[in-house]
Amino acid sequence: MRTLWIMAVLLLGVEGSLVELWKMVFQETGKEAVKNYGLYGCNCGVGKRGKPVDATDRCCFVHRCCYKKVTGCDPKKDRYSYSWENKAIVCGEKNPCLKQVCECDKAVAICLRENLGTYNKNHRVTVKFLCKAPESC
């Protein structure tokens, strides 16, 4: 029950590309992004940093690094457009910055799908203080 409450709090005030990211993750993995990845490992979710605990967590680490390279827009708030064509994500954004955000989100969604075999339910709620020092991007 407590986990559901935490997830509900994380959803408050969500806007912009996070919604698109969550849709992409569901389309690629079949898993609800917030429930399955919102607190996963040491890198998935808001404010988490640390040495990745597995390949799934590394996807989130690489995604955060990708967002750090984005300039000219806010990756977490500004909305972009994409489509789902023949079971593939197609970033259709004309704005170069928003296209870059879309490509970052597409990459993490595909990475999570490719690493479904490393997904460990024991890492679904990892407490931040248990994480080791983060790597640099």
From Swiss-Prot:
<keyword id="KW-0378">Hydrolase</keyword>
<feature type="disulfide bond">
    <location>
        <begin position="91"/>
        <end position="102"/>
    </location>
</feature>
<dbReference type="GO" id="GO:0016042">
    <property type="term" value="P:lipid catabolic process"/>
</dbReference>
<protein>
    <recommendedName>
        <fullName>Basic phospholipase A2 PeBP(R)-I/II</fullName>
        <ecNumber>3.1.1.4</ecNumber>
    </recommendedName>
</protein>
<feature type="active site">
    <location>
        <position position="105"/>
    </location>
</feature>
<feature type="disulfide bond">
    <location>
        <begin position="59"/>
        <end position="111"/>
    </location>
</feature>
<dbReference type="GO" id="GO:0006644">
    <property type="term" value="P:phospholipid metabolic process"/>
</dbReference>
<dbReference type="Pfam" id="PF00068">
    <property type="entry name" value="Phospholip_A2_1"/>
</dbReference>
<dbReference type="InterPro" id="IPR033112">
    <property type="entry name" value="PLipase_A2_Asp_AS"/>
</dbReference>
<keyword id="KW-0959">Myotoxin</keyword>
<dbReference type="GO" id="GO:0005543">
    <property type="term" value="F:phospholipid binding"/>
</dbReference>
<dbReference type="GO" id="GO:0047498">
    <property type="term" value="F:calcium-dependent phospholipase A2 activity"/>
</dbReference>
<dbReference type="GO" id="GO:0005509">
    <property type="term" value="F:calcium ion binding"/>
</dbReference>
<feature type="disulfide bond">
    <location>
        <begin position="66"/>
        <end position="104"/>
    </location>
</feature>
<dbReference type="InterPro" id="IPR036444">
    <property type="entry name" value="PLipase_A2_dom_sf"/>
</dbReference>
<feature type="signal peptide">
    <location>
        <begin position="1"/>
        <end position="16"/>
    </location>
</feature>
<dbReference type="GO" id="GO:0090729">
    <property type="term" value="F:toxin activity"/>
</dbReference>
<dbReference type="InterPro" id="IPR033113">
    <property type="entry name" value="PLipase_A2_His_AS"/>
</dbReference>
<feature type="disulfide bond">
    <location>
        <begin position="65"/>
        <end position="137"/>
    </location>
</feature>
<dbReference type="GO" id="GO:0005576">
    <property type="term" value="C:extracellular region"/>
</dbReference>
<comment type="similarity">
    <text>Belongs to the phospholipase A2 family. Group II subfamily. R49 sub-subfamily.</text>
</comment>
<keyword id="KW-1015">Disulfide bond</keyword>
<comment type="function">
    <text>Snake venom phospholipases A2 that have myotoxic, and edema-inducing activity, as well as extremely weak lipolytic activity. PLA2 catalyzes the calcium-dependent hydrolysis of the 2-acyl groups in 3-sn-phosphoglycerides.</text>
</comment>
<feature type="active site">
    <location>
        <position position="63"/>
    </location>
</feature>
<keyword id="KW-0964">Secreted</keyword>
<keyword id="KW-0800">Toxin</keyword>
<dbReference type="InterPro" id="IPR001211">
    <property type="entry name" value="PLipase_A2"/>
</dbReference>
<dbReference type="InterPro" id="IPR016090">
    <property type="entry name" value="PLipase_A2_dom"/>
</dbReference>
<dbReference type="GO" id="GO:0050482">
    <property type="term" value="P:arachidonate secretion"/>
</dbReference>
<keyword id="KW-0732">Signal</keyword>
<feature type="disulfide bond">
    <location>
        <begin position="42"/>
        <end position="131"/>
    </location>
</feature>
<feature type="disulfide bond">
    <location>
        <begin position="73"/>
        <end position="97"/>
    </location>
</feature>
<feature type="disulfide bond">
    <location>
        <begin position="44"/>
        <end position="60"/>
    </location>
</feature>
